[in-house]
């Protein structure tokens, strides 16, 4: 049995890390949250990730140890091939993905892919970016502009303006609905 790869996307500040952290706290026997390999210090940012040097990253990529990889915001990101084992064992796997690299995920996982785009209103997004304090005003404006102009096609939209609990419940409902549909195919 093949699980689904849930490719969670959204602009920086949309709440992806908070959503993933909350999901990790809930008991989900068939849903695994994948960690990412990133060329960023382990203490930088709020994301639970595995920090790699660029050399380590390129070594893993060169040895085909990354199922998916991409470059964004001056960093390299990757998801290990272990997710393929999890999917083939029947687990659903949730990945903090990239909007720009959705086509790469579609090409590899095809019908097993469930793309979900996390969205928030511009006002809330600005507030979140300002509160976390990682970007200056011009960087925040650039992120807001990119968020406004780039929403992937053919993906499920999940609004994250409300409570974190509500967003997690909605995401789990979507995943379970797709499980039923997937089982009927």
Swiss-Prot record:
Q: What superkingdom does the record give?
A: Bacteria
- Catalyzes what? alpha-D-ribose 1,5-bisphosphate + ATP = 5-phospho-alpha-D-ribose 1-diphosphate + ADP
Keywords on record: ATP-binding, Nucleotide-binding, Transferase
Give Gene Ontology CC terms: cytosol
Pathway in which this enzyme or protein is active: Metabolic intermediate biosynthesis; 5-phospho-alpha-D-ribose 1-diphosphate biosynthesis; 5-phospho-alpha-D-ribose 1-diphosphate from D-ribose 5-phosphate (route II): step 3/3
Disulfide bonds listed in the record: none
Gene3D superfamilies, per the entry = P-loop containing nucleotide triphosphate hydrolases
Q: Which GO terms describe its molecular function?
A: ATP binding; ribose 1,5-bisphosphate phosphokinase activity
Q: What EC class is this?
A: transferase
Tell me its EC number(s), please: 2.7.4.23
Quick one: a GO biological-process term for this protein? NAD biosynthetic process
Positions of ATP binding: 10-17
Function (record text): Catalyzes the phosphorylation of ribose 1,5-bisphosphate to 5-phospho-D-ribosyl alpha-1-diphosphate (PRPP). Accepts ATP but not GTP as a phosphoryl donor, and uses ribose 1,5-bisphosphate but not ribose, ribose 1-phosphate, or ribose 5-phosphate as a phosphoryl acceptor.
Sequence similarity: Belongs to the ribose 1,5-bisphosphokinase family.
The protein's name in its UniProt record: Ribose 1,5-bisphosphate phosphokinase PhnN
> Which species is this UniProt entry from?
Escherichia coli (strain K12)
In the UniProt record, the gene name given for this protein reads phnN
């Amino acid at each position: 049995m093949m699980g689904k790869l849930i490719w969670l996307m959204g602009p920086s500040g949309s709440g992806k890390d908070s959503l993933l952290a909350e999901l990790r706290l809930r008991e989900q026997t068939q849903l695994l949250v994948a960690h990412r390999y990133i060329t960023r210090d382990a203490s930088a940012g709020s994301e639970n990730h595995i920090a790699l040097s660029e050399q380590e990253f390129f070594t893993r990529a060169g040895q085909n140890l990354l199922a998916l990889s991409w470059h964004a915001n001056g960093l390299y990101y990757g998801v290990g091939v272990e997710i393929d084992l999890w999917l083939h064992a029947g687990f659903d796997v949730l990945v903090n993905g990239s909007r720009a690299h959705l086509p790469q995920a579609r090409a590899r996982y095809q019908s097993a892919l469930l793309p979900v785009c996390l969205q928030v209103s511009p006002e809330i997004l600005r507030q979140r970016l300002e509160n976390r304090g990682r970007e200056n005003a011009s960087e925040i404006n650039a992120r807001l502009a990119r968020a406004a102009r780039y929403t992937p096609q053919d993906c499920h939209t999940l609004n994250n303006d409300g409570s974190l609990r509500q967003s997690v419940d909605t995401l789990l409902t979507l995943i379970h609905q797709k499980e039923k549909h997937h089982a009927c195919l």
